[in-house]
Amino acid sequence: MAVGKFSEPLNNYIRENKINNIYISSFIPQKLILSKTDVFITSGGHNSILEAIYYKVPMLITPISSEQRMNGLLLEELGIGETTYSLNKNASISSQINKLLRKQLNVNKLNEISNDLRNQNNNFKSMWDYIYDN
């Protein structure tokens, strides 16, 4: 989990509570994570959504702004993601993540959109490689 300036207090909390399956950092290379993950929990910003689609990763959107709420609704309509409006609803979030992990969404649609994105923008990979390396 990338949390910027909040990484130290969250790491302290994780150590104190002996939580072993969460990694906290001020920066995490998102492309690397997306290339190896099954579900992406994100606030639903445009670039994060594009990167998740590129890597064919279903998303759980936890929107903060109205744009992100709209993005979540669009992903739900396409069948390639879920949206939650409260991180306090643990049971709801758990069931949404399980739904995404069980591929109870439109995997064909996610593959189709990802392939379209890759084909329409032949320089997408090289652009991100350039940004990441520089």
Can you say where each PLM-predicted feature lies in the sequence?
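A donor-sugar binding/catalytic signature common to diverse glycosyltransferases
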Residues: 27-73
